Amino acid sequence: MATKKAGGSTKNGRDSNPKMLGVKVYGGQTVTAGNIIVRQRGTEFHAGANVGMGRDHTLFATADGVVKFEVKGQFGRRYVKVETV
């Protein structure tokens, strides 16, 4: 009969998969319509002109142009817009 002491238990040993969030296109870079600009959880950045927001708060370009980030308003909200050329 094999004699092996039973192994203990642990509460560690797991991790979640990476979500690949963040800014994908920076200010001054060109985009085409449909390009993802920011992937985020919640509205860390808000959609400005020529930018749409997906159901997971992803910001994407709705027109071709150049990306511009700006801070506006009383609460310092960060907006992303696409300026058409």
UniProtKB/Swiss-Prot annotation:
Any one GO BP annotation for this protein: translation
InterPro entries per record: Ribosomal_bL27 (IPR001684), Ribosomal_bL27_CS (IPR018261)
Highest taxon, organism lineage: Bacteria
Residue segments, region Disordered: 1-20
Record GO terms (molecular function): structural constituent of ribosome
One Pfam family linked to the record: Ribosomal_L27
Keywords (A to Z) from UniProt: Ribonucleoprotein, Ribosomal protein
Gene Ontology cellular-component terms listed: cytosolic large ribosomal subunit
Parts forming coiled coils: none
Family: Belongs to the bacterial ribosomal protein bL27 family.
NCBIfam families found in the cross-reference section: L27
PANTHER family referenced in this protein's UniProt entry, alphabetically: LARGE RIBOSOMAL SUBUNIT PROTEIN BL27M, RIBOSOMAL PROTEIN L27
Protein name stated in the entry: Large ribosomal subunit protein bL27
Species whose genome carries this gene: Acinetobacter baumannii (strain AB0057)
